[in-house]
């Protein structure tokens, strides 16, 4: 005997020993094709190991489950509505056989009963393709644990099973459960709706309470995985003890509840997510009320989100805001009246077609218990009943197709389970304006709703405040919620408040939601999309202030014409240019006079021309540096200035030689005069300066560079040289040496004839140049900010003025105002007087 045969043999034995008689017309309706219904009319949360006693539990001994009876009536209503519909299954009567499964305690016996023949036998066969069971399909049960138990049996026979409220993601596995479908979205969508609700209200610090069964464990784990990817942290997770509402708690169970509520009180989290069957929560909420834990937001899973009995604990309104995830509300016309009429609403009780029957088909108190909650059930929009209603219609449409029905008749024939299953997978119809079809996982994509519990009798007790659409995986239509807070403010549930813009997170503890907020320093920014825990440095050409999320381009700073310092220096340069040009004209008109010739003659025109060129180079300091302007700054201007200073130095040396060294070294002086010593010296100095300039340009380059202003980092200074101070020292080193030489020779000639004594003027010019250059280098060694360029230009213009006015100015003064001293006779008399004094 193979494994399959052994399984069937075991099922036959169980069926034979477990069957007991019971009968109630509310549970049975004869018909051409029977549907099996599994509903929790009573609830035993702990279960019973009843197989050890070979005895089926008596469900009527347990707590009545109002919603379960309501769902059973939805199945009865759907069957009777279909039987009265001439367009669907014309000429065919659907029947049903309904069993109370006591939540999880009574699942095996009913499914064996549904699978057996009328004689309660399950024959051993190699092939069950042609096997005919008592029912053609099973609707239910209501929870995932029971559904898996039942599906393991029904899948062996490919007998269609449609559950209306089991949400476990395990049920999507069609290899394990090929005959299982459901008319409710899976746990994946329920959890996603919860998470999107938390994200919408910025709740990232939550508490999770789960029941100790598979439902609580699986959904708690799924929520933990989902929130971890959304930066939502679980402060703690606790398992609630499994308790019956009418059951006395043990001391351990009571202490367990006290401990859990104590942790709720001490936690800073104010959002509590509860995955638990409804009946296990009565003792828990009584303890919450006893300890007066208020101000929380309670998020209910679908198992208790619309439970009317739990809602009847009106004191819960003081605990905070209750939100629940449940199936969308689809009103079914006529159902409320059908439920209120009870069994009498259906057709008269009929005799069974055979003497086969099963147990747990009685519920004496169900109708009265349901009627006591009739108002709340009606106002709540009859939620979930549509899932049962649509499941029955899905089977009916599949039968309609399988039997080849037309508008008036159907071909009644034997229906095998696997044939009906194939047709159910294909159904696609509209029921009360909703499209019903099964996706590849066997689910119907009905919308979910977020409901808020209300205790105002004039309102819907489960008021819809948002909708979740499984196909788009989006939470939409979020409405205003009546928060049980001061001024109706949205409750806060965050371990740490959100950091402000430009603040990085510093983790505190093990939870990513707990952190300190630290400002990003200037020059750094926070990129939330890349790293919220580290501030990134700005690129070199950008800057940021403290606490920024982006950098901005640094302000490029250079001399501009509209600035006051630039205008002032430009006016000085213009004054120097005009005065130098005037001096050139004066010297040209008095070229043959002794003063001009004693000042250097042709050499004066070279100096004045170079000074004019230097003044004309001043504008290249203004505006953004370019290669051409940098070339003028680093080559043309230094060269012009060096030649001018070298002329002064050579002229000083020449005068000293003529009066003091010619008599002592006549031969050397004759060579100096014969071989044009002054011009050779100037040419040598010029070549040396050109070498220095070329070396400097090769070392630093001509391309403009930028550097950050140390006093204001948001400013970038554009200059021609990346190492401005060293370049200035290198470029002016020869000029400083020449100024010292010129000053020395001028000082040596202080006793020369008055007309040749230029010590005062050369000393003034060279001393000013030397002092200003040293001061500029000192200033630049201590400061490298935006003022360097303007100070450098100012010193340059002042040095040019010192030569133009300090050296040539006195000579022009003598030419213009003392013409009698600009004669050969006067100069000869001065030389004779100097010679006589020496003798």
From Swiss-Prot:
It comes from Homo sapiens. It is a multi-pass membrane protein. Residues 1-19 form the signal peptide. Forms heterodimers with TAS1R3. SUPFAM superfamilies: Periplasmic binding protein-like I (SSF53822). Residues 588-602, 657-681, 749-760, 806-839 are cytoplasmic. It is found in: Cell membrane. This is Taste receptor type 1 member 2. PANTHER family: CALCIUM-SENSING RECEPTOR-RELATED, TASTE RECEPTOR TYPE 1 MEMBER 2. Keywords: Cell membrane, G-protein coupled receptor, Glycoprotein, Membrane, Receptor, Sensory transduction, Signal, Taste, Transducer, Transmembrane, Transmembrane helix. Belongs to the G-protein coupled receptor 3 family. TAS1R subfamily. The lineage of its organism: Eukaryota, Metazoa, Chordata, Craniata, Vertebrata. Glycans are attached at residues 84, 248, 292, 312, 368, 428, 487, 527. GO terms for molecular function: G protein-coupled receptor activity; sweet taste receptor activity; taste receptor activity. Gene3D superfamilies: 3.40.50.2300, GPCR, family 3, nine cysteines domain. Residues 20-566, 624-635, 703-727, 782-784 are extracellular.
């Amino acid at each position: 005997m193979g494994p399959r045969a052994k399984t069937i043999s075991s099922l036959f034995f169980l069926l034979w020993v477990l069957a007991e008689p019971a009968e109630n017309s509310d549970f049975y309706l004869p018909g051409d094709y029977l549907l099996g219904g599994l509903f929790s009319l009573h609830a035993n949360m702990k279960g019973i190991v009843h197989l050890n006693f070979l005895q089926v539990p008596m469900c009527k001994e347990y707590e009545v489950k109002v919603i379960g009876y309501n769902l059973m009536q939805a199945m009865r209503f759907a069957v009777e509505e279909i039987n009265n519909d001439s367009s669907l299954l014309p000429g065919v009567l659907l029947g049903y056989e309904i069993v109370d499964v006591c939540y999880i305690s009574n699942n095996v016996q009913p499914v064996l009963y549904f699978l057996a023949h009328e004689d309660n036998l399950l024959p051993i066969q190699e092939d069950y393709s042609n096997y005919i069971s008592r029912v053609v399909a099973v609707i239910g049960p209501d929870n995932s644990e029971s559904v898996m138990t039942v599906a393991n049996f029904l899948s062996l026979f490919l007998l269609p099973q449609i559950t209306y409220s089991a949400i476990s993601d395990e049920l999507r596995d069609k290899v394990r459960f090929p005959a299982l479908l459901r008319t409710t979205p899976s746990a994946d969508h329920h959890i996603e709706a919860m998470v999107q609700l938390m994200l919408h209200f910025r709740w990232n610090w939550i508490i999770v309470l789960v029941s100790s069964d598979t439902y609580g464990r699986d959904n708690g784990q799924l929520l933990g995985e989902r929130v971890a990817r959304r930066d939502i942290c679980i402060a703690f997770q606790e398992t609630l003890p499994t308790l019956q509402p009418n059951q006395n708690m043990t001391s351990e169970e009571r202490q367990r509840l006290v401990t859990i509520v104590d942790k709720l009180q001490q936690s800073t989290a104010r959002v509590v997510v509860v995955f638990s069957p409804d009946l296990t929560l009565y003792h828990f909420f009584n303890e919450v009320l006893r300890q007066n834990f208020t101000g929380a937001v309670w998020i209910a899973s679908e198992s208790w989100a619309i439970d009317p009995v739990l809602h009847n604990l009106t004191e819960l309104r003081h605990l905070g805001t209750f939100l629940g995830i449940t199936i969308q509300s689809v009103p079914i016309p006529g159902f409320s009246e059908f439920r209120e009429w009870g069994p009498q609403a259906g057709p008269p009780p009929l005799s069974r077609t055979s003497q086969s029957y099963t147990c747990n088909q009685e519920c004496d108190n169900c109708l009265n218990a349901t009627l006591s909650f009739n108002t709340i059930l009606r106002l709540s929009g009859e939620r979930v009943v549509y899932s049962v209603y649509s499941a029955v219609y899905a089977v009916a449409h599949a039968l309609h197709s399988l039997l080849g029905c037309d508008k008036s008749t159907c071909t009644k024939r034997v229906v095998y389970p696997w044939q009906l299953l194939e047709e159910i997978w294909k159904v696609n119809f509209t029921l009360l304006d909703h499209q019903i079809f099964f996706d590849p996982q066997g689910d119907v994509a009905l919308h979910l709703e977020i409901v808020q519990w209300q205790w105002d009798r004039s309102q819907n007790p489960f008021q819809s405040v948002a909708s979740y659409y499984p196909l788009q995986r989006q939470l939409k239509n979020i409405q205003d919620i009546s928060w049980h807070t001061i001024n109706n403010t949205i409750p806060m549930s965050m371990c740490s408040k959100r950091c402000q813009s430009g603040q990085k997170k510093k983790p505190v503890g093990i939870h990513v939601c707990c952190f300190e907020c630290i400002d990003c320093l200037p020059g750094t920014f926070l990129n939330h999309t890349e790293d919220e825990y580290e501030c990134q440095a700005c690129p070199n050409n950008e800057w940021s202030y403290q606490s920024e999320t982006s950098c901005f381009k640094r302000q490029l700073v250079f001399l501009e014409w509209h600035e006051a310092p630039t205008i002032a220096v430009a006016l000085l340069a213009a004054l120097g240019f005009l005065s130098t040009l005037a001096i050139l004209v004066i010297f040209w008109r008095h070229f043959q006079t002794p003063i001009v010739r004693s000042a250097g003659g042709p050499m004066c025109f070279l100096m004045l021309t170079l000074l004019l060129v230097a003044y004309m180079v001043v504008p290249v300091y203004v505006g953004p540096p370019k290669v051409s302007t940098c070339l003028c700054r680093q080559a043309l201007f230094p060269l012009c200035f060096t030649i001018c200073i070298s002329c002064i130095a050579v002229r000083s040396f020449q005068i000293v030689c003529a009066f003091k060294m010619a008599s002592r070294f006549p031969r050397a002086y004759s060579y100096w005069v014969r071989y044009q010593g002054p011009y050779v010296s100037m040419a040598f100095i010029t070549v040396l300066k050109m070498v220095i300039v070329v070396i400097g340009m090769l070392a630093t380059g001509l391309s403009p560079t930028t550097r950050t202003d140390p006093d204001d980092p948001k400013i970038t200074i554009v200059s021609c040289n990346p190492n401005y101070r060293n370049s200035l020292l290198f470029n002016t080193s020869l000029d400083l040496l020449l100024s010292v030489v010129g000053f020395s020779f001028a000082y040596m000639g202080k006793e020369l004839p008055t007309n040749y004594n230029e010590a005062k003027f050369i000393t003034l010019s060279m001393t000013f140049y030397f002092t200003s250059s040293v001061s500029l280098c000192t200033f630049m060694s201590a400061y490298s900010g935006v003022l360097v360029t303007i100070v450098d230009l100012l010193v340059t213009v002042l040095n040019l003025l010192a030569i133009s006015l300090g050296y040539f100015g006195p000579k022009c003064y003598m030419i213009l105002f003392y013409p009698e001293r600009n004669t050969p006779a006067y100069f000869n008399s001065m030389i004779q007087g100097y010679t006589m004094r020496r003798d």
